[in-house]
Amino acid sequence: MIDRYKHQQLRIGSVSPQQISAWATKILPNGEIVGEVTKPYTFHYKTNKPEKDGLFCERIFGPIKSGICACGNYRVIGDEKEDPKFCEQCGVEFVDSRIRRYQMGYIKLACPVTHVWYLKRLPSYIANLLDKPLKELEGLVYCDFSFARPITKKPTFLRLRGLFEYEIQSWKYSIPLFFTTQGFDTFRNREISTGAGAIREQLADLDLRIIIENSLVEWEELGEEGHTGNEWEDRKVGRRKDFLVRRVELAKHFIRTNIEPEWMVLCLLPVLPPELRPIIQIDGGKLMSSDINELYRRVIYRNNTLTDLLTTSRSTPGELVMCQEKLVQEAVDTLLDNGIRGQPMRDGHNKVYKSFSDVIEGKEGRFRETLLGKRVDYSGRSVIVVGPSLSLHRCGLPREIAIELFQTFVIRGLIRQHLASNIGVAKSKIREKEPIVWEILQEVMQGHPVLLNRAPTLHRLGIQAFQPVLVEGRAICLHPLVCKGFNADFDGDQMAVHVPLSLEAQVEARLLMFSHMNLLSPAIGDPISVPTQDMLIGLYVLTSGNHRGICVNRYNPCNRRNYQNQKRSDNSHYKYTKEPFFSNSYDAIGAYRQKRINLDSPLWLRWRLDQRVIASRETPIEVHYESLGTFYEIYGHYLIVRSLKKQILFIYIRTTVGHIALYREIEEAIQGFSRAYSSGT
């Protein structure tokens, strides 16, 4: 359905036989009503044309080629002067062939058939409304037993013999033998009921409002009883109360949606449009057909056989009629959901037929693959890799993907700058990958965000906006802090990239969907852009230097790996390697890049004269005096250089290159935030 705002919506539910007939029936210009599929044939083996009244009939579903009828006559579509609008010889309308994608047909069933979704799927809606065990209803549907009709003030065959409902099982094989087909049909319609028709009668007699009232009264009575002390009885009461709640909710849903319970039993079976169950020709002249066509043929064969038994044959035993009704029910079950009753139906190659349920459900079904996950223009897909040098709101887009996504914008830029005279020349420049193309692409991408999506999109953070930058390679680069929102990692995950085209979509992406504006979880409000996995390991490596002070390094001989102690060959004690001094962090990082020190090697870094570094009442571990009168006071984690007059000249802190790098990153982030805040105010 489409509402007034043109939002397309899809609702799945039960429909009435009248609605099915309205969908599938059409009236030809000569007044003839068509829509019923009566023959199980598809194409004629000689003419290779659809059979009349078959599963691909052009009278029912429309012409295969636009404006051409089954006879080969041609009419201009939409020309009002052309008359008639259909072929009087074959009855095919001169319309567009796309009608075969949505024009339905129907099969008029010779007996009512229960919809297997409502009977066998758990919870069973039919069993819930009728308040009967599912096994009992299955036996009734598949003609394993019958029940007596409540006929008052009339003598009946069953009542004269004193039979009751539970005794009819013994008459299953004996009663039909006394009647012909016509006589048994009269007897059954009068006194007994079985099959899906019995279910339909019971559902039609239900009053949903009375069901709600009675269920609420029973629920209150069970609640007043309280606990009995018997665990088994208490569980039984609890299960019954849960059942009553589900029954009330189901009845309210039927009332709210104007659905009648008897619609769960089918009298008319819809036939899908031919284009949704095609027969195609492959190499070698062989034909490939959708499995649904074979399942439809099975239903039509059995339904036609039952129709012949009920109308033409008068000497057929009633038991054969009941068996044929069971076969029709099983054929419809297989069409709707193959394998739901046990062993699935297979073809000659032992391959399971794909039923209607198999076509629409699952990851490769019609909804998730074709409707929800369909391919769209201005989109791409690639593997994600980590981009540690990216900002939080940026993503790295490979050149190959970027030039395809923004090709129309690049063409417009080339023409506007008079670098190309037309679209063809612009495309040739793009194919040749001239340098000017990448310059224009950079300009286009600067003001155009892109959307990254990782399936499954379970919450709103599954799709976020980023500012793209060109990167080499063929993988999308992503900042590691946004991975938690996507539930992504870098072990081969793929992400889709989309380009918002309209101005409204770009504004929405900038104001609502940018990654740096989605730092908190929308569900619980906790921070979601937090370090995980590789980032935690990296932080550990950066800060895994000396945590125990100078004493351990200098005097503990076992700690020679981290602090580069070397064993002398002439005696049994260790040589201490002097820890280097650096006047600033740039010199320390430069020494690391030159491989003069390791990432976790301890060093002395000159620090600003901050009294907070100096611990009060702490005595130095060592004091080193120099010839000029200055001396060094060495403490556990810092060092003070004093003058001859004991004035503090310098302070050195004991740290590692990893700590320095982490501190610089934090300091730059704070300074950037301060600048942004000051400019904003």
Swiss-Prot record:
Keywords, comma-separated and alphabetical: Chloroplast, DNA-directed RNA polymerase, Magnesium, Metal-binding, Nucleotidyltransferase, Plastid, Transcription, Transferase, Zinc
Gene Ontology CC terms: chloroplast; DNA-directed RNA polymerase complex; mitochondrion
A GO biological-process term: DNA-templated transcription
Record keyword Metal-binding present: yes
Gene name per UniProt: rpoC1
Enzyme class, first EC level, given as a word: transferase
Native source species: Nicotiana sylvestris
Lineage: Eukaryota, Viridiplantae, Streptophyta, Embryophyta, Tracheophyta
Domain of life assignment: Eukaryota
Quaternary state and interactors: In plastids the minimal PEP RNA polymerase catalytic core is composed of four subunits: alpha, beta, beta', and beta''. When a (nuclear-encoded) sigma factor is associated with the core the holoenzyme is formed, which can initiate transcription.
Family, as annotated: Belongs to the RNA polymerase beta' chain family. RpoC1 subfamily.
Catalytic activity annotation: RNA(n) + a ribonucleoside 5'-triphosphate = RNA(n+1) + diphosphate
Cofactor requirement: Mg(2+); Zn(2+)
Enzyme nomenclature, EC number: 2.7.7.6
Compartments in which it is found: Plastid, Chloroplast
Major location category of this protein: plastid
Protein name as it appears in the record: DNA-directed RNA polymerase subunit beta'
Residue positions binding Zn(2+): 69, 71, 87, 90
